């Protein structure tokens, strides 16, 4: 089969690969939206796994989703390592079939389990590959894919990938276009927060963070005494209970398991306390939210690396998970929450580092790859 992007008899065909977590799916969808805005006639297909968040998020955004088998790469010798060649070969065949049926002009990968077989299949078919790496420390799939691509983009300036261009993190327009000052009153009303009291919003991500939950709940009396109101996004199935097994309640404290639309959170918060996933760090910087980051203490340390530039610039504070305690919250967080001058300075420094138009930059890179 011959792939000819100059063929005017068919619209541009773009295949975007990635998934497993919202950290992969959100930028993928932002890139898709920006491509559709620039090229409304484009045929856009997303590729993910059968069990990731993409199975819900991609169709909800109005895009078609194809799936291939999930092929994790074992990090140490195991039975899975022995099975890897056969599994990878099968996934590459699936990927090739998808690309051929889509008559793809370009493959865009954002990382995750599906990307390695998609990159390998696209290389065999001589389809241009465009890569976006979200984390400061590049994942394995994108390190492999970067060897086959002349169009590599990164969210963080310090990410080490061959030939990488710093474009920022593609994000939803509701976030990238957010004016916090204008949106704050409506956002606070929507989240059940008082319009005047300092607001701390706490989240551990979609799966929650037990260590954060414990520290915050133990510090609630001190937070309330300082006049601080707390919205606690606990994570699905992670509701905080009291000693009698009921939902914990306290003065100035409200908990929810999930918030649909982080733009309201960013607009309403005086301080956000959160993990340091690449998406969260990038969104916080783009819209200028003062933040306290508690990097996930497992994995390859990528969350601390994600947050480091923003912390160094003075736009955020970072505390190790092991050091997050009620005492730290009383001695460090409460003085921050009640210091309006410092919060304004953090917001200014944060926004100066952020990038709001990464989706447009990525769409331009995709179109550049097609025309190269």
UniProtKB/Swiss-Prot annotation:
<dbReference type="InterPro" id="IPR004276">
    <property type="entry name" value="GlycoTrans_28_N"/>
</dbReference>
<dbReference type="InterPro" id="IPR006009">
    <property type="entry name" value="GlcNAc_MurG"/>
</dbReference>
<dbReference type="GO" id="GO:0051991">
    <property type="term" value="F:UDP-N-acetyl-D-glucosamine:N-acetylmuramoyl-L-alanyl-D-glutamyl-meso-2,6-diaminopimelyl-D-alanyl-D-alanine-diphosphoundecaprenol 4-beta-N-acetylglucosaminlytransferase activity"/>
</dbReference>
<keyword id="KW-0131">Cell cycle</keyword>
<feature type="binding site">
    <location>
        <position position="135"/>
    </location>
    <ligand>
        <name>UDP-N-acetyl-alpha-D-glucosamine</name>
    </ligand>
</feature>
<keyword id="KW-0133">Cell shape</keyword>
<keyword id="KW-0132">Cell division</keyword>
<dbReference type="GO" id="GO:0008360">
    <property type="term" value="P:regulation of cell shape"/>
</dbReference>
<protein>
    <recommendedName>
        <fullName>UDP-N-acetylglucosamine--N-acetylmuramyl-(pentapeptide) pyrophosphoryl-undecaprenol N-acetylglucosamine transferase</fullName>
        <ecNumber>2.4.1.227</ecNumber>
    </recommendedName>
</protein>
<comment type="similarity">
    <text>Belongs to the glycosyltransferase 28 family. MurG subfamily.</text>
</comment>
<keyword id="KW-0472">Membrane</keyword>
<dbReference type="Pfam" id="PF04101">
    <property type="entry name" value="Glyco_tran_28_C"/>
</dbReference>
<feature type="binding site">
    <location>
        <position position="206"/>
    </location>
    <ligand>
        <name>UDP-N-acetyl-alpha-D-glucosamine</name>
    </ligand>
</feature>
<keyword id="KW-0328">Glycosyltransferase</keyword>
<feature type="binding site">
    <location>
        <position position="303"/>
    </location>
    <ligand>
        <name>UDP-N-acetyl-alpha-D-glucosamine</name>
    </ligand>
</feature>
<keyword id="KW-0961">Cell wall biogenesis/degradation</keyword>
<feature type="binding site">
    <location>
        <begin position="21"/>
        <end position="23"/>
    </location>
    <ligand>
        <name>UDP-N-acetyl-alpha-D-glucosamine</name>
    </ligand>
</feature>
<dbReference type="GO" id="GO:0050511">
    <property type="term" value="F:undecaprenyldiphospho-muramoylpentapeptide beta-N-acetylglucosaminyltransferase activity"/>
</dbReference>
<feature type="binding site">
    <location>
        <position position="172"/>
    </location>
    <ligand>
        <name>UDP-N-acetyl-alpha-D-glucosamine</name>
    </ligand>
</feature>
<dbReference type="GO" id="GO:0071555">
    <property type="term" value="P:cell wall organization"/>
</dbReference>
<dbReference type="Pfam" id="PF03033">
    <property type="entry name" value="Glyco_transf_28"/>
</dbReference>
<keyword id="KW-1003">Cell membrane</keyword>
<comment type="function">
    <text>Cell wall formation. Catalyzes the transfer of a GlcNAc subunit on undecaprenyl-pyrophosphoryl-MurNAc-pentapeptide (lipid intermediate I) to form undecaprenyl-pyrophosphoryl-MurNAc-(pentapeptide)GlcNAc (lipid intermediate II).</text>
</comment>
<dbReference type="GO" id="GO:0009252">
    <property type="term" value="P:peptidoglycan biosynthetic process"/>
</dbReference>
<dbReference type="GO" id="GO:0051301">
    <property type="term" value="P:cell division"/>
</dbReference>
<dbReference type="InterPro" id="IPR007235">
    <property type="entry name" value="Glyco_trans_28_C"/>
</dbReference>
<keyword id="KW-0808">Transferase</keyword>
<dbReference type="GO" id="GO:0005975">
    <property type="term" value="P:carbohydrate metabolic process"/>
</dbReference>
<dbReference type="GO" id="GO:0005886">
    <property type="term" value="C:plasma membrane"/>
</dbReference>
<comment type="pathway">
    <text>Cell wall biogenesis; peptidoglycan biosynthesis.</text>
</comment>
<dbReference type="GO" id="GO:0030259">
    <property type="term" value="P:lipid glycosylation"/>
</dbReference>
<keyword id="KW-0573">Peptidoglycan synthesis</keyword>
